[in-house]
Design a protein with these regions (language model features):
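Metal-centered catalytic cores of metalloenzymes
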Residues: 1-83
Length: 83
């Protein structure tokens, strides 16, 4: 299990997400951005718009995705979840 923040995933806050894969982190971040946008959190609106627009810009989206996967791979395992 590893930890990444909303900010590490392109968002504006330091909410921590936990997961075993980069894909889990991305899904958790997407849910977080949707919830923040629904709640009217204007600080999260740019990141939410980027998330929604990824499918329209596949090359840029793949660059972002590879960056997240690289960052995730470089993170240490969480101490309290290490096996």
């Amino acid at each position: 299990m590893k930890t990444m923040t909303c900010r590490q995933l392109g968002g504006p806050c330091d909410l921590e997400h936990h997961g075993d894969t980069a894909d889990e982190m991305i899904k958790t971040q997407d849910r977080h951005l949707k919830q923040a946008a629904r709640a009217g959190d204007s600080a999260h609106e740019p990141a939410h718009a980027d998330m929604k627009g990824r499918w329209r810009h596949p090359k840029r989206a793949m660059g972002w995705y590879r960056g997240v996967k690289r960052t995730f791979a470089e993170l240490p395992q969480d101490a309290h979840h290490a096996s």
